[in-house]
């Protein structure tokens, strides 16, 4: 199942980012950075993804690049930087498909690592009210209720 999901994700990445980038320069750079990430070279991958944002800032791949950057920063325990990357998705790509993930991952950082349950609750709430179709909807509800103090979960 995981392989099928990976293949579908790759197909959508190529399809979504081939229209405006007919030479696929941004997509090629993204795939090279993603390969470094797969090879566990997180610091190198992070630098490459950041360079993509500089070189292809107006490219449709920018939101997915920001998501990768945020996840790497979280893995490297750069929590404030990760939140900043996720916020950029929320603010600059508000109509994109990664907003729910950015909200959820930010909430998780606030809850698990920065000990700020109020900010986490506010972000979980945004997922609950604005992204009912998100795969993070149910978990956001659960975490929100736990932070609110519900005992009948």
Mark where each language-model region is:
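Acidic, polar-rich low-complexity tracts and alpha-helical solenoid repeat scaffolds
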Residues: 1-153
